[in-house]
């Protein structure tokens, strides 16, 4: 299923973080915070400085979670994006 964000929004797939600490302790899923980084999957036509495939950091409480084809995504407003990782 294709999803085209409208307005000044982007569709993001969260980047999974490691499930163990530096000392090797396994962190259970319910104890982990959701990552604040992701990869841009789709961009609205109004946004020109962010492209598909960009890695971004976003605000902790920003965005709306959606599920498409059994995958979880986040729809973010442009204002919730903190920066592009290069």
Swiss-Prot record:
It comes from the Bacteria. InterPro entries: Chaperonin_GroES, Chaperonin_GroES_sf, GroES-like_sf. GO terms for cellular component: cytoplasm. Disulfide bonds: none annotated. One of its GO terms (molecular function) is protein-folding chaperone binding. Its main location: cytoplasm. Keywords: Chaperone, Cytoplasm. Gene3D superfamilies: GroES chaperonin. It holds the Pfam family Cpn10. CDD domains: cpn10. GO terms for biological process: chaperone cofactor-dependent protein refolding. It is found in: Cytoplasm. Belongs to the GroES chaperonin family. Heptamer of 7 subunits arranged in a ring. Interacts with the chaperonin GroEL. Together with the chaperonin GroEL, plays an essential role in assisting protein folding. The GroEL-GroES system forms a nano-cage that allows encapsulation of the non-native substrate proteins and provides a physical environment optimized to promote and accelerate protein folding. GroES binds to the apical surface of the GroEL ring, thereby capping the opening of the GroEL channel. NCBIfam families: PRK00364.3-3 (NF001537). This is Co-chaperonin GroES. It comes from Campylobacter jejuni subsp. doylei (strain ATCC BAA-1458 / RM4099 / 269.97). The gene is groES.
């Amino acid at each position: 299923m294709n999803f085209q964000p409208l307005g000044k929004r982007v569709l993001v797939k969260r980047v999974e973080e490691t499930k163990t600490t530096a000392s090797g302790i396994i962190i259970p899923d319910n104890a982990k915070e959701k990552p604040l980084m992701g990869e841009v999957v789709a961009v609205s036509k109004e946004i020109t400085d962010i492209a598909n495939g960009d890695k971004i950091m976003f605000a902790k409480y920003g965005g709306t979670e959606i599920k498409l084809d059994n995958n979880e995504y986040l729809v973010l407003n442009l204002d919730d994006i903190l920066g592009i990782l290069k």
